[in-house]
Amino acid sequence: PVWSWHVGTAVRPREDRGLVSDDLYIAAKRVVSLLADAGHESYFAGGCVRDRILGLLPEEYDIATAAHPPQVRAIFPRARRVGEAFGVMLVRQDEYMFDVATFRTDGSYADHRRPNSVTFSDAQHDAARRDFTINGLFEDPIKGEVIDLVNGRADLEAGVVRAIGDPRKRLDEDHLRMLRAVRFAARFNFAIEDETAAAMQ
């Protein structure tokens, strides 16, 4: 498939949800800013972007970046390894902890749960490896823009859970993705897209 790049204004969450303080957002934005100031393309990624567009206040923020683990540690010397082989570092900012993950592509999934290997890549390939289009969005909190490489925003607006790429391949990589599809559909009152639903049978 051809992944299109759409940029739009991010939607700030409604403040009446009360899940967490907005201090979490400020701390997460600070992590992105420090990475960007060091010259590394960096974004909010995945579920936090989805929730913000839906008007929900995220309980956590994941950050995706072009920085490799040693570069992350150079900026955050106390960063901890939580999956360095997969490009994931745990960074503390203020009193909050954030997963900071290097953009990557995944190798084969021999155990139907985790990739055997990863290759560090770019934002486009990182979005393409994710499970569902609604979780494949990035947000640049500095510019206040949503970066949509997988047409996820249209599926959010339509209320659709759709696998990225080939649904059978995507679900076979990690069998728990089928449960996640059902959970997202129930949580947001979304429909599971036909080809994705067929791949779950």
Predicted regions and their residues:
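Catalytic cores of the polymerase beta-like nucleotidyltransferase superfamily
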Residues: P1-Q201
